Amino acid sequence: MTRILVQRGSSGSSSNSSRPSSSSSSSSGSETQINNNIPVPPVTIDEEITDEKQEEVTVVEKAECSDAKDVAVDSDEPADREDDEGLVVAENVHVQSEGIDCDSPVSGGSNSDSPPVPAPPPKPSSTVNPGSNRSVLGSFGALRIGPTRRAAGPRSLVSSRSSPTGSHPSSPRSHSENEGYNSSDEHMPCYVPSHPGSGLEREHQFEAEIRYSKGFEIRRMLEDGNCLFRAVADQVYGDSEAYDLARQMCMDYMEQERDHFSQFITEGFTSYLKRKRRDKVYGNNVEIQALAEMYNRPIHIYSYSTEPINIFQGNYSTDTPPIRLSYHHGNHYNSLVDPHRLTVGAGLGFSSLSGRHVDKEQVKAAIKAQQEHQIDNALLAEGRFYSDLELTEKEIERSVMEASRAEYLMEWSKPRIGPKESSTSNAETSSSGARPSGSDSKPAEAVKEKTVLSSSIEMVLSMGFSYAQAMEAYSIFGDDVDSMVCYVLETSCGGNNRRKGKATE
């Protein structure tokens, strides 16, 4: 769509362009004459342009009219703006319409049906030059520059209000308003070394020195702004994820001791506590002192040295091990752990008591339990000793009895041969002599049996033992019936011989 606007009241022509006093009117007249003489060719793009594009072109033309005013303001002669404003607006709209029509001869399009466009006359430098406006807005690409720059203006004003130092999001005010602001490290870039000598080599050297001299291990904390509370939670609770609990308890303690800690805060104490309760807000020396008093444990700070550079004491004297932290890069804390002496849980819940009286009852109970355990172990060991001794004695007694039995059997087998020989010799002698009567021999045999079978042997036999066992026991113990019975019971082979009668009782 091509729109041609004609400036009313312009009486000049292209022949009057040589006048320096009326250059603006002559230029508008020349443009009007050119547009009146040149026939407008058929526009083929209008057939393809939709209603939305037509509305867009109209809106752009309106926007460029205002841009033309802006260009007029930026000129070197602001006094001529009111006189030439109408001319400038008309010229800009005319040029923009030419820029939109791709086949327009004024915009430099090649058309065989249209005559060549004559060059415009030169303009004097003393007046407002509308050609400069055309050079800016004479093309379709330049047509989009005006609104874009105008829209970017307010955004640049808003962004200029941001903090020039790139402060932490948790900072309450900008850097220019931080007079008396305690947490100045919150405005520093996160985890940037504050001195050129710090780096990986220095970190490794410090870690090696502290391990060699003190035996401490550096347990690294997450670098998220909660490093101080993470390190303290790792030392006290054994879990760095309990950092929020340590933070809130620290703020509660500082609020409880407002009269003391407010002396070290140069800003509003309530706003300070409110900000420090937020996540990822740095902790400083004030919070470290509060943590030392709250847990009643001294806090030792190590920073690239084997000795603490700062020590924070609690309220009371205590013998609990200190909380050891390592300070890196001027804004990060890690936990220093002694692997041979764990200090997790020391001082929990007893911040108002001395450390040497904290676990008095528990120590007594532990000592008593240890003593009872030692007594039980001693009794058990004694029982084992006596049981072993008894078994040893029984084994010795058994071996002695077996040895004596073997000896008896050897001796008992020899006397049985002797009486037979004596009986045969007696028989030979008696056969030669007078033979006694049979009545005399029978009582002699009965007496012999009575003398051999004593009362102890008979008692053993009555208990169900064999004659050989009774005779063996009798040969060893004599008439001691109890010893004979015990011996027979011991020498009986397990379940081979049944224990009968009074022996089982």
Curated annotation (Swiss-Prot):
Q: Which GO terms describe its cellular component?
A: cytoplasm; nucleus
PROSITE patterns recorded for this chain?
Answer: OTU (PS50802), UBA (PS50030)
Bias (Acidic residues) occurs at 73-86
Stretches assigned to the OTU domain: 216-339
Q: Can the keyword Ion transport be found in this entry's annotation?
A: no
| One of the GO biological process terms | negative regulation of gene expression, epigenetic
Give yes or no: UniProt keyword Repressor: yes
Q: Low complexity composition bias: which ranges?
A: 9-30, 159-173, 421-441
Give its localization: Nucleus; Cytoplasm
SUPFAM superfamilies membership: Cysteine proteinases, UBA-like
Region Disordered, annotated ranges = 1-191, 416-447
Keywords assigned? Activator, Chromatin regulator, Cytoplasm, Hydrolase, Nucleus, Protease, Repressor, Ubl conjugation pathway
Tell me which EC number(s) this protein carries.
3.4.19.12
Q: Which residues form the UBA domain?
A: 446-491
One Pfam match, by short name?
A: OTU
Q: Which InterPro entries match?
A: OTU_dom, Papain-like_cys_pep_sf, Peptidase_C85-like, UBA, UBA-like_sf
Q: In which tissues is it expressed?
A: Mostly expressed in stems flowers and siliques, and, to a lower extent, in leaves, roots and seedlings.
Q: What domain of life does the UniProt record list for this protein's source? A: Eukaryota
Q: Where is the composition biased (Basic and acidic residues)?
A: 51-72, 174-188
Catalytic activity field: Thiol-dependent hydrolysis of ester, thioester, amide, peptide and isopeptide bonds formed by the C-terminal Gly of ubiquitin (a 76-residue protein attached to proteins as an intracellular targeting signal)
Cite the record's note on assembly: Interacts with KDM1C.
**PANTHER family attached here?**
OTU DOMAIN CONTAINING PROTEIN (PTHR12419), OTU DOMAIN-CONTAINING PROTEIN 5 (PTHR12419:SF4)
As for family, the record states: Belongs to the peptidase C85 family.
| Role summary | Hydrolase that can remove conjugated ubiquitin from proteins in vitro and may therefore play an important regulatory role at the level of protein turnover by preventing degradation. Binds chromatin (e.g. nucleosomes and histones) and has enzymatic histone deubiquitinase activity, specific for the H2B histone. Can both repress (e.g. OSR2) and promote (e.g. AN3) the expression of target genes by associating with chromatin, deubiquitinating H2B and regulating its euchromatic histone marks (e.g. H3ac and H3K4me).
Which protein are we looking at? OVARIAN TUMOR DOMAIN-containing deubiquitinating enzyme 6
* Native species: Arabidopsis thaliana (Mouse-ear cress)
Whichever gene encodes this chain, its name is OTU6
